[in-house]
Amino acid sequence: MLKEKNLKWLSLFTTVLMLFVQIGGALVTKTGSADGCGSSWPLCHGKFVPTHIPKETLIELAHRGVSGLALLSVTWLVILSIKYIGHKKETKFLCYMSIGFIFAQALIGAAAVMWQQNGFVLALHFGISLISFSAVFLLTLLIFEVDQKFDATKLILQPKLRRHTIGLTSFIYFVIYSGALVRHEKASLACSSWPLCRKGAFILPQNFYEWVQMSHRTLAFILFIWLTYVAFHAMRNYAQYRVIKYGYMIAFILICLQVTTGALTIFTAVNLYIALLHALFITLLFGLLCYFILLISRAK
């Protein structure tokens, strides 16, 4: 019983850590702190503790520290999960996903520091860390046996909801990548208005940065319409299943918050707190959609 309780605490701690890794990565990009330690990795300016620590260096060091702690925590969680709940069919798959993608995340992060990758490669960093977070999040739900609490094993889902959920989860990943590309290509303020690029002018983007920005907005708009439709379909037709009804209700709230913070990012000239909330909401939404995929795999 004590071991089970300790595993639950470890899984919660690791999930929160992974969330901080996500937000920390966004903070590094938004504050221009990616070069805070120069081209040195894992050292900072060639030293274990640099003598001069400006704000950018402090942010980069903090992100590296949290990422390193998360790597250790995920490794320990994976070992204990296989030992104590390895009999559950999803455990090993989620463990391999958690550990594999956090190592991939670390390697891409190191490569970005040492060899100055372009924006298209750097955008993968956020996406890969998102998969690792989602795997840890699902592993935590598995440890807490959330499915049993919501009677999720008794779900009967029609092919329509299954197809839409899988499609949404795949599509949102491309939306997230396009958003990360906006950050890394420094195209956040390429358009001065919202939702159009120029106020009152419905014209095509005029340069690369506007194309990056408007491509992300277009994909985000499609995602909003699609998820809204699926959420109301699920709440109307699956009201007897709390996990579906309230799960999609939360998903709808998160996508509304995501769109709102996206617009506010433009209106506030990329306010740091708004930008970090924007990254937080999409992380939570992606994790929730991945949970729906887990439910689909168990439903009749």
Swiss-Prot record:
**Which stretches are Cytoplasmic in the membrane topology?**
1-8, 86-92, 145-163, 240-249, 297-300
Residues noted as binding heme b in the record, renumbered to the chain: 216, 278
- Pathway noted in the entry: Porphyrin-containing compound metabolism; heme A biosynthesis; heme A from heme O: step 1/1
Sorted alphabetically, the Gene Ontology cellular component annotations on this record are:
plasma membrane
Using the UniProt record, give the first listed, main subcellular location. Answer: membrane
According to its record, how does it sit in the membrane?
Answer: Multi-pass membrane protein
Where is the secretion signal located? none
The active site of this protein is located at 60
**Which reactions is this enzyme annotated as catalysing?**
Fe(II)-heme o + 2 A + H2O = Fe(II)-heme a + 2 AH2
- Quote the EC number: 1.17.99.9
Which keywords belong to this entry?
Cell membrane, Disulfide bond, Heme biosynthesis, Iron, Membrane, Metal-binding, Oxidoreductase, Transmembrane, Transmembrane helix
Pfam families hit by this protein: COX15-CtaA
What are the TM regions of this chain, as residue ranges?
9-29, 65-85, 93-113, 124-144, 164-184, 219-239, 250-270, 276-296
Residue numbers on the Extracellular membrane side: 30-64, 114-123, 185-218, 271-275
Any GO BP annotation: heme A biosynthetic process
Tell me where it resides: Cell membrane
Report the family membership: Belongs to the COX15/CtaA family. Type 1 subfamily.
Q: Which HAMAP family match?
A: HemeA_synth_type1
Output the PANTHER family linked to this UniProt entry. HEME A SYNTHASE (PTHR35457:SF1)
Q: How does it associate, per the subunit comment?
A: Interacts with CtaB.
Per the record, the domain comment is: The N-half (TM1-TM4) and C-half (TM5-TM8) domains are connected by an intracellular loop. Each domain is formed from four-helix bundles and they align in a pseudo twofold symmetry manner. The N-half domain is the substrate-heme O binding domain and the C-half domain is the cofactor heme B binding domain. The cysteines of disulfide bond Cys-37 and Cys-44 may be involved in transfer of reducing equivalents from quinol in the membrane to the active site of the enzyme.
> Per its record, how is this protein called by name?
Heme A synthase
Name the species this protein comes from.
Macrococcus caseolyticus (strain JCSC5402)
